[in-house]
């Protein structure tokens, strides 16, 4: 019996780039050899850009965006995804720009206690309105294959 799915949770975290490349190559070989899908759980947007076909972005244990990898990097819709991508150093921009990285303001929500209504990102979101604190946005398809959980769409 061969698996249909391999779940790899942070397989490249804290590895140097050489070992990271070897791990990713091994995962791709397994995928091709066994004809299985890989669910890659990572915070490394570079790894995502290089290896993923679809991306699911989560914030505070809630899915906030799902899209094909190219579309997500080209046009992220959720304010958290936008902030996440703006906070990544870029070599092509850093050499010619004095623009600083933009950290996401605020702190990560606690997941202790009962789940509260509202968008979990609302306390950190510059675009949040009162309704965002009281209602949880549904994940809805706003373009073919691109879903977002945000009342702005």
Give names to the regions the model predicted.
Residues 2-3, 7-11, 15-97:
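P-loop NTP-binding/switch modules centered on Walker-like glycine-rich loops
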Residues 68-153:
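Charged, flexible cofactor/metal-binding loops and thiol motifs
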